[in-house]
Structure formats: C-alpha cells, structure tokens
Amino acid sequence: MGNRGMEDLIPLVNRLQDAFSAIGQNADLDLPQIAVVGGQSAGKSSVLENFVGRDFLPRGSGIVTRRPLVLQLVNSTTEYAEFLHCKGKKFTDFEEVRLEIEAETDRVTGTNKGISPVPINLRVYSPHVLNLTLVDLPGMTKVPVGDQPPDIEFQIRDMLMQFVTKENCLILAVSPANSDLANSDALKIAKEVDPQGQRTIGVITKLDLMDEGTDARDVLENKLLPLRRGYIGVVNRSQKDIDGKKDITAALAAERKFFLSHPSYRHLADRMGTPYLQKVLNQQLTNHIRDTLPGLRNKLQSQLLSIEKEVDEYKNFRPDDPARKTKALLQMVQQFAVDFEKRIEGSGDQIDTYELSGGARINRIFHERFPFELVKMEFDEKELRREISYAIKNIHGIRTGLFTPDLAFEATVKKQVQKLKEPSIKCVDMVVSELTSTIRKCSEKLQQYPRLREEMERIVTTHIREREGRTKEQVMLLIDIELAYMNTNHEDFIGFANAQQRSNQMNKKKTSGNQDEILVIRKGWLTINNIGIMKGGSKEYWFVLTAENLSWYKDDEEKEKKYMLSVDNLKLRDVEKGFMSSKHIFALFNTEQRNVYKDYRQLELACETQEEVDSWKASFLRAGVYPERVGDKEKASETEENGSDSFMHSMDPQLERQVETIRNLVDSYMAIVNKTVRDLMPKTIMHLMINNTKEFIFSELLANLYSCGDQNTLMEESAEQAQRRDEMLRMYHALKEALSIIGDINTTTVSTPMPPPVDDSWLQVQSVPAGRRSPTSSPTPQRRAPAVPPARPGSRGPAPGPPPAGSALGGAPPVPSRPGASPDPFGPPPQVPSRPNRAPPGVPSRSGQASPSRPESPRPPFDL
C-alpha cells in the first residue's frame, strides 16, 4: 500500500463522514468516496456482499435499495457491524444487519416502494476486508412499481446526481455482461458527469451468464468501449446459489476457478475477480483521497471562516442569564434607534442600491408627490371665470357697477384655498405610511426576539399615530391661517394696477395675433399606442409640450415635425394596460366630442413606467390640460340648461375686463399661497412627526419597554433562532474536528499515476453489442494509437505471467498476433496486420518496447 500514512487515509475519511453525518451535513460536503451505480438488478449489492463476505443487504424483486447506503469497510481482527443511527450497538449477526437496514429504510420512506436521499451509514469491521468507503445507490429503473410515483425514474436520477456530480467521488459503474454494454445506464451517467473518464471504474458482472459462444474478452482487455481506468470482471452468486445459502467464501473460490478455467479469461485471471477489485478500489480511493485532501482542507477552512464571526456571538451564549438579557435589550434598542436614524437621515455606509430608503421616499413625497397633488387641485379655467363673473354680478346686485369689486377676489381666493386641505392631509397620510414601513424594516433585525419585536413595533407605531393627529391639526391650522387674512400687500402680489395692465396686454395680444416665443414645458419620448397595424402600428416619437400646443417629431433633433395639436379643449384620462402590454398608457381627448388626431377620438400615449406617466400628467396640468372627472358630463348638461356658455359669449366688454382682472389677481395670490404651503408643509411634518418620533425612540422607547412587564418574557428567543444557533455551533465544531483530523495525517506519499487517456468516443455510438468479438465490433476508429485487429474467436491468448520489462504503465497498445491458420475452421479468415491511414503510428515511449513479432499479454491499467 505504500506506508502507514497511506493506510490511514480511508479511516480518516470515515471519521470525517461520521462527524458530518451526525449533524446532517454529509450531503453538502464533498468527501472522497466511491459511488456504486448501475441498472436495476445489475449486481451492485452482490458485489458489495462479496467484499464483506457476508449476506447483509436486502434482496427481492423491483427496487430493493431505496436509500443510499454509505458502507465503510474497516480492516480489523474481529468481525462486527455498527450503524451510525444505533451508536454503541454492535451487530455480530449479519441477518440482523439486513433487518435493521430494511427497518431504517421503511422508517423514512414508508413500506411502499418510495425512495429517499437520506443515507444510512453502516461500518463493517472484518479481517477479510480492505479499508474502503462505498455508497450503494438505488438501481436505475424506468417503470414505476407498486405505489411508486410516475416520476420514479427522475427521482432516482436526481438522487444519483447528488453523489456522482461531486469531483471527489469515484464512480463504480456496474454493468451486466449479458446485456448491451453500449446502452449501459451506469456508463451513460458516468460519461455525462465525468466526460474525461478520470473518475470512472468499470465493473462487468454476470460473465457466467453470457450466451454460449460469446465472451467479454475485448471489454475486459479495455479494447472494446475503453475506459481510462479500465474494467474488472466479477462473477457473483446466482439466485440458485443464494436460495441454497451458498457460502460467499465458496462463491469466491468458484469465481477464481471460473477465470482460471475459461479459455477467454485465463490470461486475465490475476486481474479479475472480487479480491482484485477490492485491492484496486482500495488503492485508487487511497490515491484519490491523497490527491483531493489539499482541496478539501481549503474548502473546510473557507467554510470555517465564513461562519466564525457569527459563531463568536454564540460561544458564550447563556439563554437564561438575566445580565445577558438586559445587555441584549439595551443593544437591540440602541441598534433600532441607529437604524431608524440612518434610514431617515441617510448615511454613507451600507447604502442600499436596490430600493429607496424611508428618508428618500419621504423626500420624494415632499418635493414630487405633494406639489403634484396641489397642481391637480388647481381650478378649471372656464369654471373659475364663470364663478368670478357670478361673484361680480351678485355683489353689484341690481345696481350697475362701475368698479371691480375686491370682495369678488376674496370670495374666489377663499374657495380655492379651501381646496388645499385635501392634498395636505393626503401628504401627512403618505408620510405616516412611509414611517410605519421604515419601523417594520428596522425591526427585522429583532426577529430572533419575536416578543420584543412585536412590542417595539406597537409602541413606536402608537406614538406615530398620536403624532399624526397633532400634525393634521397643525396642517389644518396653516390652511385656516391663510383663510383668515388676505395679505394683498405681499411683495410678490401683482396688485390691482398690474392686474389691470396685464388684462389689457392679453386683450391686445388676442387682437394683434403677434405672440412672443412660447415657453416649452416638457420634452421627451412617448409612444402613440392606438395606431392600427395596417397604418404602421405603435411608434415612438419625440414630443414637445408648450402652454399652447403639443407637437411631435420623428426624433429629438426636432427637424421633421409629424403633427401639432392645440391643447385647447383637451383633457386627460387613464387607459388600462393591454393583456400583453408592459407599457403604462394615458389618453388625450377633446371635450367637444371632436376627433383629436386624424380620425381618432382619442390619442393614446404610452410610457415605460408609471412614474413617467405621472410626470407627463403634471406637465399637462401646467399646460392647462386637466384629468377627466366623473361628473364632467353632468356639469356639461347643466351648463347647457343654464345657458352659461351663451352668457359668457355675450358678456359685455366691461364685465369681461373685470373678470380678467380678478382672474389675474387670484392667479397671483394663489401662487403665493401654494408657495407658502409647499414650503411649510415639509417643515411642519418634520418637526411634529419625524423629528419627534426620532427623539422618542432615543429617549423614551426603552422606558416604555421596561414598563410593559417582565423583561424575561420580552427577551425570549424564537425557536427558529435557537435551532439556527445550535446548528451553527455543531457545524463549527464539526469543521474544527475535521481540520484537526486532516492535520494529523501525513500525505507525503508516492501513488500510482492516473492511467493515460483512451478513446472514449464510443459512448456516442448506439447499439454496439457487448461481449461479441468480431472485426466490426472493435472500438471506433477515432484512436490516438494504431488500430489493433482483434483476436479471432476461439483463439487462446498467451499464458498469464508477468509483463515484459520496460512496458509502459497502463499498457501500450497490444501488438497484433502473427497471422496463421485458425484453429477454428468456422472462424473468419486471417487478418493481415496493417497500419491504418487515419492516424500516424504511435511512438514508443521506451526503448524496451515489445517486439511486434511476439504476442504480448495486455497490461492492466493498475499497478499493484
């Protein structure tokens, strides 16, 4: 084997496996092991029983192995078995081992034919075994049996993949010799996960059950369907032998006799059979462990580092310590206060790049949402002028007024200021909602203490609700203050003279038709959504919105204008998204029931996000295009009945000038009021609600928690947190133990190198019969060495013996035998050796290569 260090490698992995199986982490750790895969009834369990020399595995029809069995063989002077789930109990009767495997399988999978990926760990001590670790996996099947689910094939495949996809897992691919080897389930799955063949070892069973006149010599010599690590043949007990209780020792003797007496296998007898397979697996697993140990150590160290910081908090953890609970309570409250302040005020560390924080959202409410709500509440132009005209006429009464009454201005302004209450209250509600959401996010770190989290959220949320009432009262007070006194001496107010002058200028502008340059309100890309497919479908254009019109161009260079639409008599309405559409849509329509664009009653415009839609709506509001209201039609019918439109058209010039003057005064004063409200609203909310809540959390939250009752109840851990802490501590100690185990082993050993690559393209060829030797059944011609004609049927190879000195490790390609008369008169004619023209001849690696004039026995890929 090499030295003592090498002999200790497999027991080392067994100790690692036990350490991690005890905490349920064995499936996640990539420990070196050998996975036994194969089709149903391929003989996997029989191979394992031959290793142990005892009957201990369940047998029967259908799927017998329904859970992975991690079988750890340990060379010992005494013979007994141990289960990891039955610690301390030694099984000396292997019939009891079989019953325990069946009982443990049924405990997890039930009594039907279901399967489970949870492994059973069995360790067998015996003087007849070599140190070895194997995993017996369920046989691959395609048809459900009994109560099995219809997808049993995929369930088994998924389970196999959990083991064989790991880089540290050797694959023992078991295939029966009496079936088509090219269609072997084991070789197919091995090729899928190990395309280079570095981890696959082939085992051929049922050699004694092949059809008469056929053999598997070419396969066992690794000529047909070659594997990098080669094939080993075994002969298991037949069902008759098992029923007759044939001793495994006698079965191994019969296996030896079979290989020595069979004319096709006698030259390979020393490299066939269960004992040889044990030695090969022991050597290859040992070498594999030695090669993978450094990587395993690095992986364990990285896992240890990743959990070390969290485990430090748990090492000295005492759940029932009152001092610990008090300290934890203070830390939780302090952390909650700091998190709340950072989310509101902002911070330079731990910046969230996925979503806006509470402070950023509140800022957006103050400076985007609230101004937009104010703009939405602005007056309708026609309605306002009508109200002003009614106010002027009602003030004059029966008299004919000579001057513009200021009471009409005051009455109109008060009505408009009163409308500001609704958006102001809505602003407070939106801020309260964001504060409550921020409190919930800050309390997420308290999930290990569910009672504390619940109580803390309740206290802070109750305080926010109390401050909400005070804040709304103050906001209403601000609006009432604006209503109490009209400050017409404000420095920004245009005054009566300026309003009259502006009215005259507007009249002149209407008559002259000369307009100054119109201010652009907004530019941007929009998609016209309701153009039919026959007319080109939806298209994106560059839109320019001014106070007078809406224009759109082919692109943002604004050279090719497509259309210009006047904003007079336009209104906005929302449009539901289409079933397959991801865009957000709104529409423009004409209030006078006219086509708004060509032959379309409405112009549907689409944006990528709802935020863009809201922004465009705010821009249209500035241009005098207002959203559609539910009562628009009723108001229109009332207007027609009252004849107000005709009244406005027939308004005398003096009244029209007075209305325009009051209109300008109202516009100027409302601009001042809106500016004041937009400025004072954020300040009021910040002072009365946000800053007050922050101060409450820092100074009064802890006192409120202490007054709630028993602090021990508050600091009770959640069951999930306690379980996580225990799992982390177990994982930490298991990793420490594993690294300690690895550190005790000396791996400075010399091992057999990996056999050279072989031509493994045969798996792409379908329906190649296994076990039939003929010139057409040789490996595919894509070789890296000269082609070798196969021996004729019935011919005997050279007597077994040591290979010639100087032969390369893994065996050079066999040299063709000398042509001559065939001892079989019914065999094929002799073949003349020739060099194939598909590849250059192989170059000998050593000077001592065997002469082609002498037949040579092929070397195995293993050096024992």
From Swiss-Prot:
- Give TM segment ranges: none
In the record's own words, the domains note is: The dynamin-type G mediates homodimerization and plays a role in self-assembly.
Q: Where is this region: G2 motif?
A: 64-66
Tell me what this protein is called.
Dynamin-1
Question: Where are the 3'-nitrotyrosine residues found in this chain?
Answer: 125
Q: Where is the PH domain?
A: 519-625
Gene expressing this chain = Dnm1
| Positions carrying Omega-N-methylarginine | 796
Question: Which residue ranges have biased composition labelled Pro residues?
Answer: 825-843
Q: Which domain of life is it from?
A: Eukaryota
Q: Which residues form the GED domain?
A: 659-750
- GO terms under cellular component: chromaffin granule; clathrin-coated pit; clathrin-coated vesicle; cytoplasm; endocytic vesicle; glutamatergic synapse; Golgi apparatus; membrane coat
> Which segments constitute the Dynamin-type G domain?
28-294
Please give the residue positions where the record annotates the modification Phosphoserine. Answer: 306, 347, 512, 774, 778, 822, 851, 857
- What does the UniProt record say this protein does? Catalyzes the hydrolysis of GTP and utilizes this energy to mediate vesicle scission and participates in many forms of endocytosis, such as clathrin-mediated endocytosis or synaptic vesicle endocytosis as well as rapid endocytosis (RE). Associates to the membrane, through lipid binding, and self-assembles into rings and stacks of interconnected rings through oligomerization to form a helical polymer around the vesicle membrane leading to constriction of invaginated coated pits around their necks.
